[in-house]
């Protein structure tokens, strides 16, 4: 089932579902509850009921790319297990139904005022202490005092743009019109505080391509990175409007909501931006349009130094922009949703996005190669591996992500620098990869030097015992000098106890000089006020003891 209409949800006051609070952002119920008929009920505008218990109307964004997402037709509309909520409208306000008319609601049979009056009965005496009732009365009093004006909301129009009311001239005056200026105050609720962070009302992400963030396809609704990707610095960079620089790299800006109530949500405050693993994408704007920056100006972007026109001109004159504009508009197209059958087999349902016209970046190629190899689609991977730069990056990313299958395939198919790969595996502490690479022909002396400078005592010990036919002074000296350079006192102790007979006084003095240079470097370039060189001092003392042993052994 394909479906592109805007869907709506009706909520009560307080907003709850199955006795659990719901609100702005990501809301989810368990699949178990969903199967029991306790999911979220959604309506098309043309099927909004005349009588339904509720206070608020909520346009919803469906997180269709969530693997747990379930969506099906029901006798009353649609039924799902997760929704993302942002805007909020009062059902006691006729303007809400005028807005719904533009989405397909028929007001011929029952006028907007009559429908609003029908819903207003829920503001009964037993709710006089409720937030909804107080909010309703405050808006009614403000209107009667002449402090408010009506605003009409066009479908898909930016919430930042005001336009004239088109209330019918023959409509009844029921005496309590609630203005949408003040409803915006209610809907622009600040994000739920997360770990003590006070988040701005509006946050944004910037992308080069319309449906792609980095190498990841994105769409309207919930978009997630895995925790592994997040830890590899592949999460979303989320900006406050005031921190958007003049020459940021990108062509589209998306307003986002942070699903702070999601159990797997992660957020880091990095001073000038936020770093997170999931966002809910709402609206999309072109950075080549001055109106985009005027909207951002309302959320804190400074337009005094560079005007909206000057900022937009940077992107309008960009060559890639001319290509991208041919397939874009101000707002995201409606998402196409796929039906999830009653078996709920965790089928992934995603919005339809095509990237066939988007040139593949190096990162995209690398990501695709990893996926092809994991799926045993080796021919597809081989075509992309012909580029040397791509090949090198595939090796690097495979080692850093501990992807042994990719490394095995690359060793079988290509000639690459085993020694560099071993060095990177040790630097990244990927010992499984290191042990696999050791099975092939490699430079043992170079590997021993790397293990010594990085402090891998077990590897040094095994190599000295098994990988060399004969231990000599040159080999021991390589270990000693590299251990001194890396400040690895345990390796120096190892040499002093097992191979002291191969060490000369000159070798020790050279190692001492290396450690003294290390101390000088630490004291000169360290940013810490409390400089710790205790390990280096212990090494110098150990070298003095070693010199005494070497000198005395000659007599």
Swiss-Prot record:
SUPFAM superfamilies (UniProt xref): Ankyrin repeat
Keyword Manganese part of the UniProt annotation: no
InterPro entries per UniProt: Ankyrin_rpt-contain_sf (IPR036770)
Domain of life of the native organism: Viruses
Entry keyword annotation includes Amino-acid biosynthesis: no
ANK repeat segments: 364-389, 390-420, 422-447, 455-488
Keywords for the protein's UniProt record, in alphabetical order: ANK repeat, Repeat
UniProt name for this protein: Putative ankyrin repeat protein L283
Species assigned in the record: Acanthamoeba polyphaga mimivirus (APMV)
Lineage of source species: Viruses, Varidnaviria, Bamfordvirae, Nucleocytoviricota, Megaviricetes
């Amino acid at each position: 089932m394909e479906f592109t209409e805007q869907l709506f949800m009706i909520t009560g006051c307080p907003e709850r579902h199955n006795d659990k609070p719901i609100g702005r952002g990501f809301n989810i119920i368990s699949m178990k509850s969903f199967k029991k008929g306790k999911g979220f009920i959604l309506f098309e505008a043309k099927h909004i009921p005349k009588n339904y218990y509720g206070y608020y109307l909520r346009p919803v964004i469906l997180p269709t790319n969530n693997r747990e997402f379930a969506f099906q037709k029901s006798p009353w509309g649609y039924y799902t297990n997760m929704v993302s909520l942002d805007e909020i409208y009062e059902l006691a306000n006729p303007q809400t139904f005028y807005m719904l008319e533009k989405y397909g609601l028929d007001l011929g049979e029952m006028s907007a005022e009559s429908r609003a009056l029908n819903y207003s009965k829920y503001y009964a005496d037993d709710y006089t202490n409720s937030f909804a009732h107080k909010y309703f009365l405050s808006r009614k009093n403000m209107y009667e005092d002449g402090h408010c004006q009506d605003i009409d909301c066009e479908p898909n129009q930016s919430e930042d743009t005001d336009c004239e009311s088109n209330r019918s001239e023959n409509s009844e005056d029921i005496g309590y019109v609630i203005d949408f200026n003040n409803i915006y105050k209610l809907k622009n609720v600040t994000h739920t505080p997360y770990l003590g962070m006070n988040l701005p009302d509006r946050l944004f992400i910037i992308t080069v391509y319309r449906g792609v963030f980095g190498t990841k396809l994105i769409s309207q609704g919930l978009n997630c990175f895995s925790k592994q990707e997040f830890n590899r610095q592949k999460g979303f960079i989320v900006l406050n409007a005031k921190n958007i620089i003049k020459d940021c790299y990108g062509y589209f800006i998306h307003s986002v909501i942070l699903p702070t109530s999601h159990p797997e949500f992660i957020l880091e405050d990095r001073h000038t931006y936020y770093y997170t693993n999931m966002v809910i994408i709402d609206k999309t704007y072109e950075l080549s349009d001055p109106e985009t920056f005027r909207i951002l100006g309302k959320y804190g972007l400074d337009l005094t130094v560079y005007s909206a026109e000057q900022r937009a001109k940077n992107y309008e004159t960009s060559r890639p922009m001319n290509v991208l504009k041919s397939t874009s508009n101000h707002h995201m197209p409606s998402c196409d949703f796929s039906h999830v059958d009653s078996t709920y087999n965790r089928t992934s349902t995603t919005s339809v996005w095509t990237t066939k016209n988007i040139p593949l970046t190096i990162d995209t190629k690398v990501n695709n190669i990893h996926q092809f190899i994991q799926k045993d689609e080796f021919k597809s991977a081989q075509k992309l591996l012909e580029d040397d730069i791509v090949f090198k990056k595939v090796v690097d990313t495979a080692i850093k992500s501990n992807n042994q299958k990719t490394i095995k395939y690359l060793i079988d198919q290509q000639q690459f620098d085993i020694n560099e790969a071993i060095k990177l595996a040790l630097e990244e502490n990927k010992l499984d990869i290191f042990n696999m690479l050791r099975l092939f022909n490699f430079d043992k002396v170079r590997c021993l030097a790397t293990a010594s400078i990085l402090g891998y005592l077990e590897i040094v010990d095994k190599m000295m015992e098994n990988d060399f036919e004969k231990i000599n002074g040159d080999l021991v000296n390589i270990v000693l000098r590299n251990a001194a350079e890396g400040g690895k006192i345990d390796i120096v102790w190892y040499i002093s106890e097992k191979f002291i007979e191969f060490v000369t006084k000159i070798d020790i003095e050279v190692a001492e000089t290396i450690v003294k240079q290390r101390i000088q470097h630490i004291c000169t370039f360290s940013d810490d006020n409390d400089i710790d060189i205790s390990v280096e001092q212990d090494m110098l003392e150990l070298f003095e003891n070693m010199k005494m042993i070497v000198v005395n052994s000659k007599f």
